[in-house]
Swiss-Prot record:
One Pfam family this sequence matches: tRNA-synt_His
Protein name: Histidine--tRNA ligase
Organism the protein comes from: Rippkaea orientalis (strain PCC 8801 / RF-1)
Membership in a protein family: Belongs to the class-II aminoacyl-tRNA synthetase family.
Gene this protein is translated from: hisS
An example molecular function term from Gene Ontology annotations: histidine-tRNA ligase activity
Top EC group: ligase
One record GO biological process: histidyl-tRNA aminoacylation
Quaternary structure annotation from Swiss-Prot or TrEMBL: Homodimer.
Domain of life: Bacteria
Reaction it catalyzes: tRNA(His) + L-histidine + ATP = L-histidyl-tRNA(His) + AMP + diphosphate + H(+)
Length: 429
């Protein structure tokens, strides 16, 4: 019997890669905290009806891509395909709207869609997202866009472009939907099969087709910007002006509609040319009707999600993220020395140092080689002699300098040890 493998569309994130993920999470937390966004953690699975009502039954996500099953209570359950619907459900269930004003929330975690796996697209994928609930002000749209660009810039990403569109309100989209159907009907037999199906269910999604012939037909399709009402046009004009005021470059893309039915007014994507076909690294927009659709009060809202897998691909191309290396590597030999080494390691860790304890029990020579490979600044050596006298050997690995110290003194004078470690680290680059 062979070993069990991961399922298609899933992958292990190994220690050699996890530093990139932790780096992204750290930068995101810092930037969003400064803007007063608070983290929220919602369940990974929800009632299926949440996504059917929230995302829209006519979408590809609900119709083709969700992982849905019956649990032992005969409830229809779905692994979340995106984060916004669950956050809105939590916002309502926990009465976060009761205090009035604006709620600024952010989340991170795995999502699930049954898609064809490829670079940057997995069936289990990870997102960082934010939601600003309670404001219909165009400044809210621009705040979330600016935060997304801040995060990506802080991560050192280049070759980024912001695509911007407005999908208007419900009335605007209904007028536009009728215009699209009238435009596409004469081309129906030339459209790809998915677009033919969308013609009746969700014609706006035809604009997002990747099929070459359909893309050619789309070039002359009417623009939704021609069907915006006065209020929608005013909102979109203000968003564009505010982006200009912040020196955030953008380009209008009338074909940008996003894949979820809850979007209203502003829709946007941030893309990178370095990602090939899967160019979008962040996408979002306004969803003023979703809270009411899920049974809550009429509440304007706007948000976005960043695809972590695609972001990590870009980071690997652009920069090296430091991996965790120990400050101190402890080697020991002999029963008493090994017991003291364990105690010493725990004391130093408690004092804030990064310590790796060699547990191999092998000869000192092999342990010293592992200490050199670890990247540690210093090595603590404990043998029978040191164990008997409650001392240790402190060896600076770059200079090979070595000194004998009292074990208790080392811990009690931890500040001096930290200062020495810092000086040696600076001296060795």
């Amino acid at each position: 019997m062979g070993t069990i493998q991961t399922l298609p569309g899933t992958r292990d994130i190994l220690p050699e890669e996890i530093g990139y993920w932790q780096y992204v999470e750290t930068i995101t937390t810092e930037i969003l905290s400064r803007a007063m966004y608070q983290e929220i953690r919602a369940p990974i699975f929800e009632q299926t009806s949440l996504f059917e009502r929230g995302i829209g039954e006519a979408t590809d996500v609900v119709g083709k891509e969700m992982y849905t099953f019956k649990d032992r209570g005969d409830r229809s359950v779905t692994l979340r395909p995106e984060g916004t619907a669950g956050v809105v459900r939590a916002y309502l269930q926990n009465n976060l709207y009761a205090t009035g004003g604006v709620q600024r929330l952010w989340y991170q975690g795995p999502m699930f869609r049954y898609e064809r796996p490829q670079a940057g697209r997995q069936r289990q994928f990870h997102q960082i997202g934010l939601e600003l609930l309670g404001s219909g002000d165009p400044r809210a749209d621009v705040e979330v866009i600016a935060l997304a660009t801040d995060i990506l810039k802080k991560l050192g990403l280049q070759s980024l472009k912001l695509d911007l569109n407005s999908v208007g309100d419900r009335n605007d989209r209904q007028r536009y939907r009728e215009a699209l159907v009238n435009y596409f009907l004469p081309y129906k037999n030339e459209l790809d099969p998915d677009s033919q199906d969308r013609l009746e269910r969700n014609p706006l999604r035809i604009l997002d087709s990747k099929n070459q012939r359909t893309k050619e037909i789309n070039q002359n399709a009417p623009s939704i910007l021609q069907y915006l009402g006065d209020q929608s046009k005013k909102h979109f004009d203000q968003v564009q002006q505010l982006l200009t005021d912040l020196n955030i470059s953008y380009q209008l893309n009338p074909c940008l509609v996003r894949g979820l039915d809850y979007y209203t007014h502003t829709a946007f994507e941030i893309q990178s040319d370095d990602l090939g076909a899967q160019a979008t690294v962040c996408g979002g927009g306004r969803y003023d009707g979703l809270v009411a659709e899920l049974g809550g009060p009429d509440t304007p809202a706007v948000g976005w999600a960043i695809g972590m897998e695609r972001l990590i691909i870009l980071l690997k191309q652009r920069q090296t993220v430091p991996h965790c290396v120990p400050d101190i590597y402890i080697v020991s030999k002999g029963e008493q020395a090994e017991a003291q080494a364990l105690i010493l390691a725990q004391k130093l860790r408690f004092e804030g140092l990064t310590v790796e304890l060699d547990l191999s029990g092998s000869a000192f020579g092999k342990q010293f080689k592992r200490a050199d490979r670890s990247g540690a600044i210093a090595c603590i050596v404990l043998g029978d002699e040191e164990a008997g006298t409650q001392t240790l050997q402190l060896k600076w690995l770059a200079t090979k300098q070595q000194e004998t110290l009292d074990q208790t003194q080392l811990v009690s004078e931890i500040g001096e040890l930290k200062a020495q470690l810092a000086r040696h680290k600076q001296a060795t680059g």
